[in-house]
């Protein structure tokens, strides 16, 4: 009512109305939701996966310590082939580790808390998804979260790999990454989502690893009449940054 046509606030109101229109026919009712709720709230499996990915990246650069990198990089096309092989191995390892960790955690949560029979019910039956604007079932959301979190983990792993390339000593690279992660964690927990600096909260390594919090919520960014979901902006920036770093 009090916003001006052509402003972001006005455009955001219209966009919000359109987005929630998608779930206007979703009927919410009480069911066995604790299995999915506890699983989506649990995030340690993502950090454990990232710890394993860091160890794999660290192992990639063992030749920096034994001097074999000179032979590898000095051969015809050696550096390019080696980089392609490492990229392929890293993506496959990320997919394998994440798949095992993700689905084993999901199964354990469902066995412990119940809810297998209600997986086809709307995800909005879980209170924390009250602002989720897509008419998905619980199992559909779990599969969506799997795909999105896999993209995030692989992108972050590739960025770390590219960062290791910048350092002659892999131990220095590891130390810098750990310090950066600690700073990101501090920022993530000390900048509120309503702050004018909330971009540092959302485009943050902690938020990217535990992407469910952003995926399941509703918030838009934009300027003028251009309105974009925060989640879409985060994934777009992550993919662009990954391509730039790997290139």
List the model feature ranges, each with a label.
Residues 73-79:
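Short helix-to-coil transition segments within interhelical loops
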Residues 79, 169-170:
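Membrane-helix interface/capping residues of multi-pass secondary transporters
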Residues 192-200:
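A cytosolic-side transmembrane-helix exit/cap motif
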Residues 171-184, 201-204:
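Central hydrophobic cores of alpha-helical transmembrane segments
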